[in-house]
Amino acid sequence: MKYLASFRTTLKVSRYLFRALALLIWLLIAFVSVFYIVNALHQRESEIRQEFNLSSDQAQRFIQRTSDVMKELKYIAENRLTAENGVMSSRARDDKMVVPDFEPLFADSDCAAMGSAWRGSLESLAWFMRYWRDNFSAAYDLNRVFLIGSDNLCMANFGLREMPVERDDALKALHERIMKYRNAPQEESGNNLFWISQGARQGVGYFYALTPVYLANRLQALLGVEQSIRMENFFTPGSLPMGVTIIDENGHSLISLTGPDGIIKAEPRWMQERSWFGYTPGFRELVLKKSLPPSSLSIVYSVPVDLVLERIRILILNAILLNVLVGAGLFTLARMYERRIFIPAESDAQRLEEHEQFNRKIVASAPVGICILRTIDGVNILSNELAHTYLNMLTHEDRQRLTQIICGQQVNFVDVLTSNNTNLQISFVHSRYRNENVAICVLVDVSTRVKMEESLQEMAQAAEQASQSKSMFLATVSHELRTPLYGIIGNLDLLQTKELPKGVDRLVTAMNNSSSLLLKIISDILDFSKIESEQLKIEPREFSPREVMNHITANYLPLVVRKQLGLYCFIEPDVPVSLNGDPMRLQQVISNLLSNAIKFTDIGCIVLHVRCDGDYLSIRVRDTGVGIPAKEVVRLFDPFFQVGTGVQRNFQGTGLGLAICEKLISMMDGDISVDSEPGMGSQFTLRIPLYGAQYPVKKSVEGLAGTCCWLAVRNTSLCQFIETSLARSGVHTQRYEGQEPAADDILIVDDALEHTWQGRAAVVFCRRHIGIPLERAPGEWVHSVASVHELPALLARIYSIELDSEALSSALPTTDKTADSNDDMMILVVDDHPINRRLLADQLGSLGYQCKTANDGVDALNVLSKNAIDIVLSDVNMPNMDGYRLTQRIRQLGLTLPVVGVTANALAEEKQRCLESGMDSCLSKPVTLDALKQTLAVYAERVRKTRA
């Protein structure tokens, strides 16, 4: 269970880890996007810085060029000034020498003294400046050069160009710089001074440079230059719309050509660095600040951040959109993966855990021992308490044997007898459990079952002995009862063939009925016993159901007429002409039902209806008898059950007839049902399958087509059957209500004729008529209601039409031989019982056969050796040599004459044994004259054919 719980926890942790993985992937993509954007930004910044540097290089070159000019001018000035009193050496000069203009810088400045003292030097310097202006100043773009005396602080102005001078602003700026210079520390007094003055237009001004002039290590003057400065010259062509500002060492803006966002305010952190590149506070502008040596000035370039981001703005939007889409996709994927993978897996794990708990509870509560053994060593991994107890009962040898069997996988169970004599049956199947090969074993205590099996075996042996005893009892009862009964019934049959005095025939008939009833009771008991012991077998063969029904109705019709009842037999035209089944057992069932119907019916009629019902042959027996209560119908087929005490008093029987019928029909794969109403009668319907059925060809009888029959039949069922039967033969039928008939018309009635019929003939269906149709008066025929299906044959006879044998329904074949026609047959009767031997001889004599007798098999062989015998009629149970060995000996002698066995044992095994010994047939005692007559007629005909 811990394994499953950890697995479920692992799934839950995996789900959260998958979420974290999706988040990390999104963050990674976002980081890559940011990195890419930052890289693009840095690249853009690098491009802008490169442009800033190119522009600043121009400014630097401007400053450096001015510084170089100052050095040259300083050199010129030092060469033109004499070393004595600041007077320049005398040189040949032009007569038109111009003295420069003097401007006092301070209120106490003495420009007259400077002009008188430095007149020659200034004239020489002015001449040189004019020469230099004419030849070189255009290249340096200088406006003017001025010289300031260190003592009198008066400025000599050497104008190089005609430029307007903002006098006040220039003097003020010059005054401030000179004061700054004079107040500077000693170590800074030799440095040049640079400053810029803003002009009238933005971005245009004047650049000033001031350098000291020393003679003999003494400061004599300050030499300065003024140069026009245009900030637009500090941009590279095609550069960004940037702003540029020049600031002094204190961060004050001197001149600027600003961009869109105005003047840049210097930051303190800029001033600490010679070169600084970055963003202003608030990230409004990107700035490059660079110093302009040798001056103390710095130039600042700036562009708005919007211009920096202009090229990467689309990239930023794409990156944001990409990250949003990726985030949404990852979220959707993670959610979908959770729903389709993790959540179902957790549910499965939950169900698996529940199943594991459920299985453990089942195993724990199972009434058998269940355990899981590892196959490699037989170690118990999991088991319930009962299995643990059983395993402790096993000896060491049993455990080793069990382990070997599990490893071998040859069998799936083993029986073990434990040390305390407990029988265990261990069955197992191989499987895997927690990544190991295991065997799931079920241990069952079969001690009770073993004892029960031993008890059942003893009971089976006892039942076998009882069955053998029962069979022996049945054989004994059959033999001992049938043998004397054969003497009674056989002699009564012979007695009825004689002419008896008046009154004696009634007594003989009563004795014959009683003996027949006794024989039926004995036969029912024996049949039921044979069915219960499964000794009664169905013997299927091809037979005609029409012949069976004709035979049954012919046998029972006299009894029905005697009780003044009516027996209607309807055989539908679609009934097969032949099918496979056991005709004797079918005849037994129908005879039993018909016998019961006759027995329980005092008034009315009995209807026997045969038709096809799908794949079954349906036979219905309906009577108008006393009926059966509904509560007793359910027990009707129980053995020895009889309906009601009143019925039991009035009617004799054992209560086995219907039980035997139900068993026999079931053995023939059929079924039987009953429908009854007290006071209205009963209806029994049995069905048997149509195995191998052959149906009649549907065709009309030639000569009957177009004929007309008038029906005056009161019985509705009879009338409907006649109409159907005649319509199949092509006969036209009409209801007769006094119409005038034609000369060839036939009238069919089921009552006596009231008037003479004027047509061809009249057919009267009579319930009391027995036998074939008879013409009792000219044109008046009487027909039995038990053979309504033979009406077309009678009509053909009336119309003088010849019918095919297929169009007629014939009864069972009978051999109509006279007594004197069998005197050519010599029959040997073999029986150890003198009464039976004498009775058989008398019966054969009454049938016209010649007869010889023998006491046993040995005597029979002696008779056979001395006489010409045609047929042997032998009992099977005799002393010295029984009928079986007699038959075998006859066959060994090469004799092929028919041998018919006579046995009092009615069991099927007895008849089968007779046939296996070589007999041709077997008759059961008591043997009636009819059975003997039919059997011997067949073999007598065979012998006659052999002689021919």
Curated annotation (Swiss-Prot):
4-aspartylphosphate modified-residue sites: D875
| MF (Gene Ontology) | ATP binding; phosphorelay sensor kinase activity
Q: Kind of enzyme, top EC level?
A: transferase
Q: Which SMART domains match?
A: HATPase_c (SM00387), HisKA (SM00388), REC (SM00448)
Assigned EC number: 2.7.13.3
Q: How does it sit in the membrane?
A: Multi-pass membrane protein
Q: Which PROSITE patterns match?
A: ABL, HIS_KIN, RESPONSE_REGULATORY
Q: Which InterPro entries match?
A: CheY-like_superfamily, HATPase_C_sf, His_kinase_dom, HisK_dim/P_dom, HisK_dim/P_sf, RcsC, RcsC_C_sf, Sig_transdc_His_kin-like_C
Free-text function comment from the UniProt entry:
Component of the Rcs signaling system, which controls transcription of numerous genes. RcsC functions as a membrane-associated protein kinase that phosphorylates RcsD in response to environmental signals. The phosphoryl group is then transferred to the response regulator RcsB.
The entry assigns this protein to a family as follows:
Belongs to the RcsC family.
Please identify the protein, giving its name as recorded.
Answer: Sensor histidine kinase RcsC
Per the record, the gene is: rcsC
